[in-house]
A protein has these predicted regions:
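Residues that mark the start of a beta-strand
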Residues: 2, 127-129
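Cofactor-cradling patches in redox/metallo enzymes
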Residues: 2-99, 135
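Generic preference for hydrophobic/aromatic residues in regular secondary structure cores
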Residues: 37, 104, 118-119
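Short, flexible loop segments at boundaries between secondary-structure elements
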Residues: 98-114
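Short, structured loop/turn "capping" segments at alpha-beta junctions
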Residues: 117-127
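Conserved small/polar residues in nucleotide/adenosyl-binding loops
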Residues: 133-140
Protein backbone atom coordinates (compact mmCIF):
# COMPACT_ATOMS: atom_id res chain seq x y z
CA UNK A 1 0.00 0.00 0.00
CA UNK A 2 1.33 3.42 -0.97
CA UNK A 3 0.46 6.34 1.30
CA UNK A 4 0.70 10.03 0.50
CA UNK A 5 1.46 11.91 3.71
CA UNK A 6 -0.64 15.07 3.87
CA UNK A 7 0.90 17.60 6.23
CA UNK A 8 -1.48 20.56 6.64
CA UNK A 9 -0.07 24.04 6.21
CA UNK A 10 -0.38 24.99 9.87
CA UNK A 11 1.48 21.86 10.98
CA UNK A 12 4.19 22.47 8.42
CA UNK A 13 4.60 26.07 9.62
CA UNK A 14 4.09 25.75 13.38
CA UNK A 15 4.60 22.11 14.37
CA UNK A 16 6.97 20.48 11.85
CA UNK A 17 7.93 17.86 14.43
CA UNK A 18 4.37 16.48 14.13
CA UNK A 19 4.94 15.89 10.43
CA UNK A 20 8.26 14.21 11.10
CA UNK A 21 6.74 12.02 13.82
CA UNK A 22 3.87 11.06 11.51
CA UNK A 23 6.32 9.95 8.84
CA UNK A 24 8.42 8.00 11.34
CA UNK A 25 5.39 6.27 12.86
CA UNK A 26 4.03 5.13 9.52
CA UNK A 27 7.38 3.92 8.19
CA UNK A 28 8.12 2.05 11.44
CA UNK A 29 4.79 0.28 10.99
CA UNK A 30 5.92 -0.88 7.55
CA UNK A 31 3.85 1.56 5.50
CA UNK A 32 5.34 2.82 2.23
CA UNK A 33 5.11 6.60 2.70
CA UNK A 34 5.71 9.42 0.25
CA UNK A 35 5.64 13.11 1.09
CA UNK A 36 4.70 15.19 -1.95
CA UNK A 37 6.88 18.30 -1.71
CA UNK A 38 4.48 20.43 -3.77
CA UNK A 39 1.59 20.17 -1.31
CA UNK A 40 0.17 23.35 0.13
CA UNK A 41 -3.05 24.12 1.99
CA UNK A 42 -6.19 21.98 1.69
CA UNK A 43 -8.26 25.16 1.35
CA UNK A 44 -10.12 25.02 4.64
CA UNK A 45 -9.18 28.55 5.84
CA UNK A 46 -10.35 30.03 2.54
CA UNK A 47 -13.60 28.06 2.52
CA UNK A 48 -14.30 29.02 6.13
CA UNK A 49 -13.78 32.68 5.25
CA UNK A 50 -16.10 32.48 2.24
CA UNK A 51 -13.45 32.43 -0.49
CA UNK A 52 -14.93 29.43 -2.31
CA UNK A 53 -13.09 30.02 -5.60
CA UNK A 54 -9.71 30.05 -3.84
CA UNK A 55 -10.64 26.98 -1.79
CA UNK A 56 -11.76 25.13 -4.92
CA UNK A 57 -8.44 25.83 -6.68
CA UNK A 58 -6.54 24.41 -3.71
CA UNK A 59 -8.87 21.41 -3.53
CA UNK A 60 -8.33 20.64 -7.22
CA UNK A 61 -4.57 20.94 -6.71
CA UNK A 62 -4.64 18.59 -3.73
CA UNK A 63 -6.83 16.07 -5.56
CA UNK A 64 -4.39 15.99 -8.49
CA UNK A 65 -1.32 15.81 -6.26
CA UNK A 66 -2.59 12.87 -4.20
CA UNK A 67 -4.33 10.95 -7.02
CA UNK A 68 -1.61 8.31 -7.31
CA UNK A 69 -1.79 7.07 -3.72
CA UNK A 70 -3.84 4.23 -2.27
CA UNK A 71 -4.37 6.28 0.88
CA UNK A 72 -3.83 9.85 1.97
CA UNK A 73 -3.02 10.21 5.66
CA UNK A 74 -2.79 13.40 7.68
CA UNK A 75 -2.21 14.30 11.33
CA UNK A 76 -5.04 16.85 11.47
CA UNK A 77 -8.64 15.80 12.05
CA UNK A 78 -9.84 19.26 11.07
CA UNK A 79 -8.21 19.20 7.64
CA UNK A 80 -9.10 15.55 6.99
CA UNK A 81 -12.75 16.19 7.84
CA UNK A 82 -12.74 19.26 5.60
CA UNK A 83 -11.48 17.16 2.69
CA UNK A 84 -14.05 14.41 3.38
CA UNK A 85 -17.01 16.73 3.85
CA UNK A 86 -16.04 19.94 2.04
CA UNK A 87 -14.50 18.65 -1.17
CA UNK A 88 -17.64 16.96 -2.53
CA UNK A 89 -19.40 20.33 -2.35
CA UNK A 90 -16.45 22.34 -3.68
CA UNK A 91 -15.66 19.89 -6.45
CA UNK A 92 -19.15 18.96 -7.59
CA UNK A 93 -18.07 19.22 -11.24
CA UNK A 94 -14.63 17.66 -10.73
CA UNK A 95 -14.63 14.10 -12.10
CA UNK A 96 -11.67 12.33 -10.50
CA UNK A 97 -11.65 12.45 -6.71
CA UNK A 98 -8.35 11.22 -5.33
CA UNK A 99 -8.97 11.81 -1.64
CA UNK A 100 -12.70 11.60 -1.11
CA UNK A 101 -14.39 8.71 0.67
CA UNK A 102 -12.09 6.04 2.02
CA UNK A 103 -8.78 7.38 0.70
CA UNK A 104 -8.11 10.13 3.23
CA UNK A 105 -7.64 9.24 6.87
CA UNK A 106 -6.64 10.98 10.05
CA UNK A 107 -3.42 9.26 11.14
CA UNK A 108 -4.78 7.64 14.33
CA UNK A 109 -7.80 6.27 12.45
CA UNK A 110 -5.51 4.94 9.74
CA UNK A 111 -3.18 3.18 12.16
CA UNK A 112 -6.11 1.68 14.08
CA UNK A 113 -8.48 0.80 11.23
CA UNK A 114 -6.18 0.06 8.28
CA UNK A 115 -2.71 -0.88 9.53
CA UNK A 116 -4.06 -2.62 12.65
CA UNK A 117 -0.78 -3.21 14.50
CA UNK A 118 -0.89 -5.76 17.28
CA UNK A 119 1.51 -3.69 19.35
CA UNK A 120 3.48 -0.48 19.23
CA UNK A 121 7.09 -0.39 20.41
CA UNK A 122 6.49 2.84 22.30
CA UNK A 123 4.12 4.66 24.61
CA UNK A 124 1.33 6.32 22.74
CA UNK A 125 -0.24 9.28 24.59
CA UNK A 126 -3.29 9.64 22.37
CA UNK A 127 -6.28 11.94 22.60
CA UNK A 128 -9.16 11.48 20.18
CA UNK A 129 -10.07 14.77 18.58
CA UNK A 130 -13.50 16.05 19.60
CA UNK A 131 -14.00 17.16 15.98
CA UNK A 132 -14.03 13.54 14.90
CA UNK A 133 -16.95 12.89 17.23
CA UNK A 134 -19.03 15.75 15.84
CA UNK A 135 -18.41 15.13 12.13
CA UNK A 136 -19.81 12.57 9.75
CA UNK A 137 -16.34 10.99 9.74
CA UNK A 138 -17.03 9.64 13.23
CA UNK A 139 -19.61 7.27 11.77
CA UNK A 140 -17.07 5.60 9.50
Amino acid sequence: MKVGLFIPCYINALYPEVGEASYKLLTQLGVEVDYPLDQTCCGQPMANAGYERDAKALAERMEALFAKYDYVVGPSASCVVFVKEGYPRLLNDYREHACIDSRIWEICEFVHDVVKPTSLPARFPHKVSCLLYTSDAADE
